[in-house]
C-alpha cells in the first residue's frame, strides 16, 4: 500500500510539473496559457480533495518533506526534457533571432522556469553523495544555464548573475577564514559580476529598455493619482492607454512615439497591483516573497530549498509578469504553506476544517471545469464567427458568463461588426470600454461609427487611437476615409500628407497599400 501511495504521489507531481510546460492546445482562445492553468488547477484541486477526504477517514498522508524532494526531482526532470526539446528545435530550425521559447509562449516565460530550476538542480546535486546523481544534476544545471542564455532574456541574465554572486560568496565563505578579507572578496565579486551584467543589459535592446522606462513613468503617474486605494480591478487596463494618449497629445514629437504600442501590463508586478488596488497590495506581495527568507533567518531550515526559486520570482516581478504563469503561483504557494505550516496544523485540528477543505477543493475543481468548457465554446464561436451566423447566437449565450471579460466583449463586438450587426457591435464595444480602453478598442469603435455614418464619433475614436499609438497607420487610414466620405478635402489632404511623410517602424504590405491609397 505504501509503495502504491508513493507511485500515485509521483504520478501526480509529474503531471503538475508537466502542466507548467504543456505545449499549445488549440481548444481555447489562448492556446498556450489557459491549458496550463486548467490542467494545473484541476490536478491540484483533485489532489487536495482526495487528500482531505483521506485525512477525514483517518488515512496517513505523505510526508511534506518527501513530497517537496520528489517535486524538485520531477521538476528538474521535466525541465531537462524541455531543454532537450529546445536543442531539437535549434538543430531543426536554427536559432531564433528573438530568443528560444521551447513549448512556452515567449522567451521570458522559459527564462522564468529555468531561473527556478537552476537553484533546484544545484541543491539536488549538492545534497546527493552518490557521484552518479551529482554528475547528472550538475549536468542538468549546466544545461539550464546554457538554454537560459539562448532565451536572450535580460531579466533571466540578471537573475543568473545574482545567483552567481550568492554562490561565489558562499564559496568564499568556506575557503577564506579571515573575516575582513572575506568581506572584501564578497564586495569585489559582487561588484564585478553585477556591473558586467548591468552593462550588458543596458547596452542590449536599448529601444526596449527605453520603452519599459516610458511605461513605468506613466504607470507611476497612475499610482500617484490614487496611491491608497488604487483604480480598482482592471484599473490599469482601463486607464493606462488613456494616459499614454494624453502624453503623446502633449508631446507629439516625443522620441517614445516610435516605441509606443498596446500595453496591458506595466512589466512590474508591484506597480501593477499598486495601480489596481493601492499601496497595501505591493507591500503584501513583497512580504509574501520575502517570507521564506524571514523564516529561514529565524532558524526554519525547511525554507532553504525555496530561497533562490522565490528570489527568482521576486527579480522577475520587478521586470516582467511572472504571476501570469502557474509555476510562479506553485512556487510561492508551496513556500507560503511551508512557512505557515504550524498555523495550518492548529487550524486543521478543528473539526470544521475536515469538512470545509473537501468542499472547497470540489468547488475549485468544478469552477475550473466550467470555465474550461465556456472558454472552449468561445473559441469555437470565434472560429465560426466569420462564416456562420449561428456563431453569434453562441456568443450571445456566452455573454452572461463573460460579461466582465473585455477580451470576450471585444471579440463579440468584432464578430457582430463583421456580420453587419452594427447596433449590437456598438453596444458591445461601449460595454467593453467599462473594463478596458486600448488602441484596438478605439480602432474598432471608429470603424463601427464610420459604417453607421456617425462620422464625428468615428473621428474622435480614430484620433484617440492615433494618440495611443502614434506609430500606427490604420487610424490615419480611418480618418482619411471619413474625411473623404464627408467631403472635407482640406483635412483629407492633410491626412494624406501625414501618411506620406510618416516613418515606418515595421514594413508590411498593408502599410504600403495605405500609402498608395492616400497618394
Predicted segments, located by residue:
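Internal/C-terminal transmembrane anchor helices
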Residues: 183-199, 350-373
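Hydrophobic alpha-helical transmembrane segments in integral membrane proteins
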Residues: 198-213, 361-390
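Alpha-solenoid helical repeat scaffolds
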Residues: 407-411, 440-445, 473-478, 508-513
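Hydrophobic/aromatic packing residues within the alpha-helices of TPR/SEL1-like helical repeat arrays
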Residues: 395-396, 429, 462, 496
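Alpha-helical transmembrane segments of multi-pass inner-membrane proteins
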Residues: 8-26, 36-55, 59, 63-96, ...
Amino acid at each position: 500500500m505504501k509503495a502504491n501511495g508513493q507511485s500515485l504521489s509521483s504520478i501526480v507531481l509529474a503531471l503538475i510539473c508537466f502542466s507548467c510546460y504543456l505545449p499549445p492546445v488549440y481548444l481555447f482562445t489562448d492556446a498556450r496559457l489557459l491549458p496550463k492553468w486548467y490542467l494545473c488547477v484541476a490536478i491540484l484541486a483533485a489532489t487536495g480533495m482526495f487528500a482531505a477526504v483521506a485525512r477525514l477517514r483517518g488515512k496517513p498522508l505523505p510526508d511534506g518533506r518527501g513530497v517537496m524532494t520528489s517535486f524538485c526531482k520531477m521538476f528538474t526532470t521535466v525541465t531537462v526534457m524541455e531543454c532537450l526539446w529546445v536543442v531539437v528545435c535549434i538543430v531543426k530550425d536554427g536559432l531564433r533571432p528573438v530568443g528560444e521559447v521551447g513549448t512556452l509562449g515567449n522567451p521570458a516565460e522559459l527564462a522564468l522556469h529555468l531561473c527556478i530550476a537552476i537553484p533546484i538542480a544545484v541543491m539536488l546535486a549538492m545534497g546527493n553523495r552518490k557521484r552518479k546523481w551529482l554528475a547528472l544534476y550538475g549536468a542538468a544545471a549546466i544545461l539550464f544555464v546554457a538554454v537560459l542564455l539562448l532565451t536572450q532574456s535580460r531579466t533571466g541574465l540578471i537573475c543568473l548573475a545574482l545567483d552567481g554572486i550568492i554562490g561565489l560568496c558562499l564559496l568564499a565563505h568556506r575557503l577564506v577564514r579571515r573575516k575582513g578579507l572575506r568581506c572584501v572578496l564578497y564586495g569585489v565579486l559582487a561588484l564585478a559580476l553585477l556591473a558586467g551584467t548591468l552593462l550588458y543589459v543596458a547596452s542590449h535592446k536599448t529601444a526596449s529598455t527605453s520603452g519599459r522606462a516610458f511605461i513605468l513613468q506613466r504607470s507611476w503617474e497612475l499610482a500617484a493619482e490614487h496611491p491608497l486605494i488604487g483604480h480598482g480591478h482592471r484599473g490599469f487596463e482601463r486607464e493606462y492607454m488613456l494616459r499614454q494618449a494624453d502624453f503623446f497629445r502633449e508631446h507629439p514629437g516625443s522620441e517614445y512615439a516610435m516605441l509606443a504600442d498596446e500595453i496591458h501590463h506595466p512589466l512590474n508586478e508591484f506597480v501593477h497591483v499598486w495601480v489596481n488596488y493601492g499601496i497595501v497590495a505591493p507591500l503584501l506581495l513583497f512580504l509574501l516573497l520575502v517570507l521564506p527568507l524571514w523564516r529561514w533567518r529565524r532558524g526554519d531550515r525547511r525554507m532553504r530549498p525555496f530561497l533562490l526559486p522565490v528570489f527568482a520570482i521576486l527579480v522577475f516581478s520587478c521586470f516582467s509578469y511572472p504571476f501570469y504563469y502557474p509555476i510562479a503561483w506553485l512556487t510561492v504557494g508551496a513556500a507560503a504553506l511551508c512557512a505557515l505550516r504550524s498555523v495550518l496544523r492548529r487550524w486543521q485540528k478543528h473539526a470544521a476544517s475536515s469538512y470545509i477543505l473537501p468542499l472547497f477543493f470540489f468547488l475549485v475543481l468544478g469552477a475550473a471545469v466550467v470555465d474550461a468548457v465556456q472558454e472552449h465554446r468561445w473559441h469555437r464561436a470565434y472560429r465560426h464567427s466569420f462564416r456562420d451566423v449561428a456563431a453569434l447566437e453562441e456568443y450571445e449565450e456566452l455573454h452572461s458568463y463573460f460579461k466582465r471579460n473585455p477580451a470576450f466583449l471585444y471579440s463579440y463586438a468584432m464578430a457582430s461588426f463583421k456580420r453587419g450587426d452594427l447596433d449590437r457591435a456598438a453596444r458591445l464595444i461601449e460595454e467593453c470600454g467599462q473594463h478596458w480602453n486600448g488602441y484596438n478598442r478605439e480602432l474598432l469603435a471608429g470603424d463601427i461609427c464610420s459604417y453607421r455614418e456617425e462620422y464625428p464619433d468615428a473621428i474622435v475614436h480614430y484620433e484617440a487611437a492615433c494618440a495611443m499609438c502614434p506609430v500606427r497607420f490604420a487610424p490615419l487610414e480611418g480618418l482619411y476615409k471619413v474625411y473623404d466620405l464627408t467631403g472635407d478635402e482640406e483635412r483629407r489632404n492633410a491626412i494624406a500628407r501625414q501618411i506620406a511623410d510618416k516613418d515606418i517602424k515595421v514594413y508590411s504590405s498593408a502599410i504600403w497599400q495605405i500609402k498608395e491609397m492616400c497618394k
